[in-house]
Amino acid sequence: MFGFKWKNQQAGGRQTTQPGIQLLASMLVCYPEIESVTYEPKDTELTMDFIVSRAVSQQELEGFVKFLDESLQTYHSLETGQAVWLAAEAEAHGETVLLHIRRQLQTMTRGELTLITALLSDKFGEQLKVD
């Protein structure tokens, strides 16, 4: 899916790397705009957290999330012809906003991650924390 090759080497009867951990670490390294990423195995969902270092109105956030969803739907429509599920929540803490974006792992692609981070960078510019 992401083009990463998983190694399944045994060391003393144990697997040396776990593919899920490798995937999460790779996402954080390849996309420094992602502050943290969490995987929920039960729901097969990824939650990506982004930090914006300025106050953002609810109206502005809702407009951006709508634009993000439309962009992802268009991207996946062109790539696979399928609609995808997206959920977003935001937490405001003074002059800082934490944006949580949830997606199903099975339909997520590397191109989609690039699109998400590019749209966030375009919208929030220097205020988007890059780690």
Locate each region found by the language model:
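Short, non-transmembrane amphipathic alpha-helical segments
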Residues: 24-27, 59-80
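N-terminal presequence-like segments and adjacent domain-start helices
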Residues: 1-19
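Polar/charged, Gly/Pro-rich intrinsically disordered segments
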Residues: 83-131
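Alpha-helix boundary/N-cap detector
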Residues: 15, 19, 59, 63, ...
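N-terminal topogenic membrane-targeting module
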Residues: 17-36
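Short beta-strand elements
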Residues: 35-37, 78-88
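A short interface-forming secondary-structure element
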Residues: 48-63
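Short edge beta-strands and adjacent turn/loop segments
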Residues: 31-47
